Amino acid sequence: MSSSPRSPDARPLKVRVKSARTRSSSSQKWLQRQLNDPYVARAKREGWRSRAAFKLIEMDEKLHVLKRGMRIVDLGAAPGGWSQVAAKKIGAAEGQGKIVAIDLLEMDAVTGVMFAQMDFLDPTAPERLFAMLDGKADLVMSDMAANTTGHKKTDHLKIIALVELAADFARQVLAPGGAFIAKVFQGGTEGTLLADLKRDYAQVRHLKPAASRADSAELYLVATGFRGSADRTEDETDEA
């Protein structure tokens, strides 16, 4: 695994996409951006399924979240870039640790990774997960993003709502001392979410990896040192 997301190979000559009658302006811009993105090219060369792999690589280089033998849940895993990185880091192919990738969409198999095509909000999801992991998880990670509308405030609220659901799922399935990683967008309404995470975890940090596009408002929350769901229940009882 290459370990320097900040120094992709020199950018190739810029590719211009010829317009097509059946292609919308937005899809044409997306295609041109993909063709000229050094991380997209590098992901193809190195065998990663998506450029998002480099985001997790960089976060782990800074915070050392991924450790051999961990039990990991990858929410919204398709196409599998994060699962690939995690599997390599924890030694899943050699029988070290376990990873369960969860998505509503189908996903091609990743060596050392178990896949569950289901909704993580299904009430049976935690128990199914415990059976697959043989216990609680050490890390829940989510690179999920809600479908966007183009309205920044609305889109931000949608992604925060999705992160809150993922954080609630993490509370149910994490072992004490566990960690939670999730994508968010800058927007100024994360106060309640951050307060909850700071209550649930010993440390909460924000990161914007180099592989995140410069014009993107995305950030990643990395929460470590899960205090345990029992601790939160006691706190809520005291506040009542």
Swiss-Prot record:
Catalytic activity line of the entry: uridine(2552) in 23S rRNA + S-adenosyl-L-methionine = 2'-O-methyluridine(2552) in 23S rRNA + S-adenosyl-L-homocysteine + H(+)
EC number: 2.1.1.166
Residue ranges that the Swiss-Prot or TrEMBL entry lists as coiled coil: none
Main location: cytoplasm
An example molecular function term from Gene Ontology annotations: rRNA (uridine-2'-O-)-methyltransferase activity
Keyword Transferase annotated: yes
Active site per the UniProt annotation: 183 (proton acceptor)
InterPro entries per the UniProt record, alphabetical: RNA_methyltr_RlmE, RNA_MeTrfase_FtsJ_dom, rRNA-MeTfrase_E, SAM-dependent_MTases_sf
Name of the protein in question: Ribosomal RNA large subunit methyltransferase E
Gene name as annotated: rlmE
